[in-house]
Amino acid sequence: MSPQTETKAFVGFKAGVKDYKLNYYTPQYQPLDTDILAAFRVTPQPGVPSEEAGAAVAAESSTGTWTTVWTDGLTSLDRYKGRCYHIDPVPGEDNQYICYVAYPLDLFEEGSVTNMFTSIVGNVFGFKALRALRLEDLRIPVAYIKTFQGPPHGIQVERDKLNKYGRAILGCTIKPKLGLSAKNYGRAVYECLRGGLDFTKDDENVNSQPFMRWRDRFLFCAEALYKAQAETGEIKGHYLNATAGTCEEMIKRAVFARELGAPIVMHDYLTGGFTANTSLAHYCRDNGLLLHIHRAMHAVIDRQKNHGMHFRVLAKALRLSGGDHIHAGTVVGKLEGERDITLGFVDLLRDDYIEIDDDRGIYFTQPWVSTPGVLPVASGGIHVWHMPALTEIFGDDSVLQFGGGTLGHPWGNAPGAVANRVALEACVQARNEGRDLAREGATIIREAAKWSPELAAACEVWKEIKFEFPAVDTLDKKKG
């Protein structure tokens, strides 16, 4: 051993592997207002104590690695390390815990969801000492929130742009999602909009395929919405999907939509990525475009209860990155979504301040200060019989989208749109009169169908259609 090496070996550095809990489990720590707080569902491998598992998560998602390194002495780990500061056993599970971790704000680049997630949900999710790991919730401090632009416009600005108040926004996804020519696609858009819908929508996987290139689709959809506006006297829109293979191409498509005078564009924020989404959100605010967000790929990340990331975290991340609408499940349709959990993250999207609420799976109080709200979108397997429940669950500040529930009408697209508009307005009127939508919903729809043949036909077609399967992602059992 050289004298130089020998000196380093004996000056405050002891090589080797230490238990994570010696440095990263700190139950005495009081989180700071500026810390990012995370609640992880941790399932350790057999024989791994909960304290070691929680500390490993804190270490591997912040400053730690598997062995002691001499460069630890060149910085202040106490300033920068993540800390597991509290652990709760999960009721009803033998070896599963909710581990709470605090991260100093200096670990994260300002205004970057990409950087935040690279640390918090990075390599630690493949850590061998853990059988499974799920990020249940985040507390984003106000100091970090203020480094983000957030949604391009928000709920109130959108209502003012559209001149639509006192009810949910009504939409429709054009079907079939793939295979239509641009002209036939535009025809379907026109029929739905003139029938009474506020918006129509590109499906998430409609980008620029050989059967329908994006520029052709944009042109025919613009023609359709202008024609429908002229006939109805209402402001209309179509979510033009700007998602593309590169950020440059995505912005080019958004620019063309703006040049056509379209009011709104769309992005698939998970497959497109947070960097691309934030860039598009900034462009939309600067150029007066609304931004609709689809969550394609979310169930790969959030559906399994023990591993991945809960959608409430993805919803918070979207509010930071930017979007005016985001799909949020339906509770009553064909897609996963338990009522209490769904209402929890719907409030996280819309409200300025949300309290801890175990009954809805909200682990942290979350203030949003001046960040605009995001409209939740209910879409997927819904039809006119669901309208009372959707109105009661989501309220006015939402977007209700009926794809098959519009284009599947036996008389065509426009009558399908009429049926949905009549059903929505009947439910809003009944609610405003003090009627109980949960109890009287079917009666309200039948009464409205007496003076709307379009609604009566829709009621007959979908009277037996239900999607009743138990939810995969459920709230934990209560203690005791």
From Swiss-Prot:
For this protein, the record's InterPro entries field holds: RuBisCO, RuBisCo_large_chain_AS, RuBisCO_lsu_C, RuBisCO_lsu_C_sf, RuBisCO_lsu_fd_N, RuBisCO_lsu_N_sf, RuBisCO_lsuI
| PTM characteristics | The disulfide bond which can form in the large chain dimeric partners within the hexadecamer appears to be associated with oxidative stress and protein turnover.
EC numbers, comma separated: 4.1.1.39
Q: Which UniProt keywords apply?
A: Acetylation, Calvin cycle, Carbon dioxide fixation, Chloroplast, Disulfide bond, Lyase, Magnesium, Metal-binding, Methylation, Monooxygenase, Oxidoreductase, Photorespiration, Photosynthesis, Plastid
Q: Name one GO biological process term.
A: photorespiration
Q: Residues that bind Mg(2+), according to the entry?
A: 201, 203-204
Q: Which cofactor does it need?
A: Mg(2+)
- The annotated site for Transition state stabilizer falls at 334
Q: What is its main location?
A: plastid
Return the cofactor note field: Binds 1 Mg(2+) ion per subunit.
List the active-site residues. 175 (proton acceptor), 294 (proton acceptor)
The subcellular location is: Plastid, Chloroplast
Q: Describe the task this protein carries out.
A: RuBisCO catalyzes two reactions: the carboxylation of D-ribulose 1,5-bisphosphate, the primary event in carbon dioxide fixation, as well as the oxidative fragmentation of the pentose substrate in the photorespiration process. Both reactions occur simultaneously and in competition at the same active site.
Q: Name the chain's protein.
A: Ribulose bisphosphate carboxylase large chain
The source organism is: Basella alba
